[in-house]
From Swiss-Prot:
Keyword match Chaperone: yes
Pfam families for this protein: GrpE
Location of this chain's protein in the cell: Cytoplasm
Family annotation (HAMAP family): GrpE (MF_01151)
Biased composition, class Basic and acidic residues, residue ranges: 1-12
Biased composition, class Low complexity, residue ranges: 17-26
PANTHER family: GRPE PROTEIN, GRPE PROTEIN HOMOLOG, MITOCHONDRIAL
Region entry Disordered, spans: 1-32
Protein name: Protein GrpE
Organism name: Pseudoalteromonas atlantica (strain T6c / ATCC BAA-1087)
Intrachain disulfide bonds: none
GO BP annotations, alphabetical order: protein folding
Length: 204
């Protein structure tokens, strides 16, 4: 190799080293930039996860609050309904003696006496109007004449042997019973038949 060629080679070597150094520095910068971006991504992902966890907790709290409010509302409605039913039952119970007195007046009145027939008719109309009015509010008369004795609605005041009726048949109603919205307000007071001693129960 001539001296001139050697000189050219020596002059080119610093240029190549400088280019390599520049490339290395650029690569390092890109790596640092990439690392910073990755760190930022991880930071954002962590923040997102924290936000989602907070949102889930808040959503759970809101749902619990809604459920609690709904339970409070239902309890309040139940208490109001109970209070209303209790007040209505008490009021209805106070009305029963009125119906009883009107019925007794009709039972003891002398229907053959022409002088009091208008009074009897007036009492009868009043009783029917009264019963019609209370039925509009959910009250129902229990008049089990001739029906099978039902201990859930009837109260047996006495029993009497009767060969013509099946045992446990309501022979007479001393006092009518009443229901209010399907609940027993007062049982009917009744006389119940029973099979004669030594006889055959016609229900068997």
């Amino acid at each position: 190799m001539s001296n001139e060629e050697q000189a050219q080679k020596d002059d080119a070597q610093p240029v190549n080293e400088a280019a390599i150094d520049a490339t290395a520095e650029q690569a390092d910068a890109e790596v640092e930039e990439l690392s910073a971006e990755q760190a930022r991504i991880l930071e954002l992902e962590a923040a997102l996860a924290a936000s989602e966890a907070t949102l889930a907790a808040q959503k759970d709290s809101v749902m619990r609050a809604i459920a609690d409010a709904d339970n409070v509302r239902k309890r309040a409605e139940g208490e109001v309904d109970k209070a209303r039913k209790f007040a209505l039952e008490k009021f209805a119970s106070e009305l029963l003696p009125v119906a009883d007195n009107l019925e007794r007046a009709l039972q003891v009145a002398d229907k053959e006496n022409e002088a009091i027939k208008p009074v009897i008719e007036g009492v009868d109309i009043t009783l029917k109007s009264f019963v019609s009015s209370i039925e509009k509010f959910g009250m129902k008369v229990i008049d089990p004449q001739g029906e099978t004795f039902n201990p859930e609605q009837h109260q047996a005041m006495s029993m009497q042997e009767n060969a013509e009726l099946p045992a446990n048949t309501v022979m007479a109603v001393m006092q009518k019973g009443y229901e209010l919205n399907g609940r027993l307000l007062r049982p009917a007071m009744v006389m119940v038949s029973r099979a004669p001693e030594g006889g055959v129960d016609t229900q068997a």
